[in-house]
């Protein structure tokens, strides 16, 4: 339903932010 869709989108956003932070930290470009 709507709740699960929102949860999935939220999870994607969080995962994307974490991935950006991780790649930024690994490349040392923070």
From Swiss-Prot:
At the top level of its lineage, which domain of life is listed?
Eukaryota
Record-given protein name: Brevinin-2Rj
Paired cysteines (S-S): 24-30
Key words of the record: Antimicrobial, Disulfide bond, Secreted
Q: Where in the cell is it found?
A: Secreted
Q: State if Disulfide bond is listed as a keyword.
A: yes
Biological process (GO) annotations?
defense response
Q: Which family would the database say this protein is a member of?
A: Belongs to the frog skin active peptide (FSAP) family. Brevinin subfamily.
Q: What are the annotated GO cellular component locations? A: extracellular region
* Taxonomy of the source species: Eukaryota, Metazoa, Chordata, Craniata, Vertebrata
Tissue expression as described in the entry: Expressed by the skin glands.
Record keywords: Disulfide bond included?
yes
């Amino acid at each position: 339903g709507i709740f699960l869709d929102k949860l999935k989108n939220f999870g994607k956003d969080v995962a994307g932010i974490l991935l950006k932070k991780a790649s930024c930290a690994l490349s040392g470009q923070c």
